[in-house]
Amino acid sequence: MQPPDTELRLLLLTSSYWPEHSPPQRRWTSLITTLCDQGWAVSVVAPVAHYGQGPDYNSDTKGHAWRVQHGFLGERIYRVPHLLLGDNRIFKLANQVIGAAGSVLRGVATGRQDAVVVTAPSLPLLGSALLVARFKGLPLVVEMRDAWPNLAEDASLVRGGSKSVINSAVEYVQNRADLVVTVTEGFARTLRERGVANVVTVRNGILMDRTPHLAAPPFDRERLEVLYLGNHGESQALDVLIRAAALVGEDMRLTFVGHGSQKPALRRLAMELGVNVRFLPPEYREAVFERYREADSLVISLRDDWKSFEDTIPSKTYEVLAIGRHITGIVRGEAANVLTEAGEGDIVGCKPQEIADLWRGLVADRGRLQPAGSGRAWVQHNAEYSDLACQYSELLRETIHEHRTHPPQSLGRRIARVGRAAVKVARNARSVRRSA
């Protein structure tokens, strides 16, 4: 096995990266911070920045197609094209295919590496990573950040014949990966039950030294301040929060911070019900902590009618646990288990009346808003990104060592493997189009 002080080179393929503000960006900029200290040189292949414009986003930092950027962590960023086609599912898929094709071309021309990591759920990008790894003769690490394709089935993104085709395509790549990484134990267990080998869990987390512990909220506040900060999409069932706030009335104020496809509909619902809801744009860094500071209870929410969410933990969970605020947990499965194990918050069902009953209880007894204090210690022990990055580094080194124990293949053999993989990926893509 390579000693820790030996520099190794990692190639990361992702659909979103800095200066965007997105789940893969937050995860990987946090991991890369420590990986570089662990002796890794990291190259990133990603589309021109276009989504979730973070605080560093501008015409220079977003990058240009086929150009190379030097990231602020010391990584090299290789940009591939992204076309502004539109926001519907067809256009999104088209852009994924374009980005995936560009990732193959760029990925094979990034110099020498020791391993390829792809962070999913983009199906086309999974195929790209397999092709790049085969061409360069490198081990492939597939990171499944969501319970996918289960989540796609729950959201009706795949139907009919396309369902089995997409499942087969994902399993094809997973079964040929040298290592599969999940962010929850539940989904890792699901993959093992399907026969996927070499599955490990490296959960999401936070950097504790950048996450303050806030003083308790005041006891004499006139109304309950409830905050949801995050994506406003179909997955979160945020309309239930508005309906619950309508039942509570003037004793509380609900604040939404962020953006997403459902935000216009949520605004309309709040107006129709006459609810005191404050809608704010996305906020970053210190502004987020100030928003937490003015809140009494922070909401973590996932809809309860998608089975895949039993194996899903919203990435904000760890930050909310560490910050020192009461948690309204509208979650089940593994996310609920984390809150229970950490000893923080109240878990309620995804029903307006249940949520309203909880909030009325908090209004009546503000002493319940005082966190137990065990959440931050739990995060320090289980979800500190510097520790998770060390775990990831060791797994990558073991995977590289195992891959190198096999006799290297000639370039001709590698090209033949790429050809076979490309044919399989192309067949799956055609099958998906015919089934759609």
Functional labels for PLM-detected ranges:
Residues 101-108, 124-135, 161-182:
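Membrane-proximal helix-turn-helix segments that form the acceptor-binding/catalytic region
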Residues 218-236, 242-245, 255:
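Conserved donor-binding/catalytic core segment of Leloir-type glycosyltransferases
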Residues 236, 284-291, 298-318, 326-338:
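Nucleotide-sugar-dependent
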Residues 350-353, 366-397:
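A charged, aromatic-enriched C-terminal amphipathic alpha-helix characteristic of glycosyltransferases
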Residues 223, 252-257, 264-290:
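Nucleotide-activated donor-binding/catalytic signature segment of Leloir-type glycosyltransferases, i.e.
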Residues 1-69, 246, 415-436:
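N-terminal subdomain of nucleotide-sugar transferases
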Residues 48, 186, 204-205:
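Carbohydrate-associated surface elements
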